[in-house]
Amino acid sequence: MALSKERKNEIIAEYATKQGDTGSPEVQVAVLTEQINTLNDHLRTHKKDHHSRRGLLKMVGRRRNLLTYLRNKDVTRYRELIQRLGLRR
């Protein structure tokens, strides 16, 4: 269910704005998106796992807040990130 260390490092390397960048909104949103997609697949097979469903909703809310922050801070970075991740915004 959780991301492997290798997969998380791949995502960080792909979306980092500079070397060693793990805290930028782009990286955080990309990692959250991967976790959300993984959890969505889990919930498709385990429909009654309400505990994980609540965790999914919390992750979606955190991602929404980060995207709102990025949109207010820099619209071009926001649009580029949405396009790269394939989010419907």
From Swiss-Prot:
GO biological process: translation
GO CC terms: cytosolic small ribosomal subunit
InterPro entries: Ribosomal_uS15, Ribosomal_uS15_bac-type, uS15_NS1_RNA-bd_sf
Database matches in Gene3D superfamilies: 6.10.250.3130, S15/NS1, RNA-binding
PROSITE patterns hit by this protein: RIBOSOMAL_S15
Keywords: Ribonucleoprotein, Ribosomal protein, RNA-binding, rRNA-binding
Pfam families: Ribosomal_S15 (PF00312)
Positions of disulphide bridges: none
Residues in the signal sequence: none
GO molecular function terms listed in the Swiss-Prot or TrEMBL record: rRNA binding; structural constituent of ribosome
Highest taxon, organism lineage: Bacteria
HAMAP family given in the database record: Ribosomal_uS15_B
Family: Belongs to the universal ribosomal protein uS15 family.
Protein task: One of the primary rRNA binding proteins, it binds directly to 16S rRNA where it helps nucleate assembly of the platform of the 30S subunit by binding and bridging several RNA helices of the 16S rRNA.
Subunit structure and binding partners: Part of the 30S ribosomal subunit. Forms a bridge to the 50S subunit in the 70S ribosome, contacting the 23S rRNA.
The protein's name: Small ribosomal subunit protein uS15
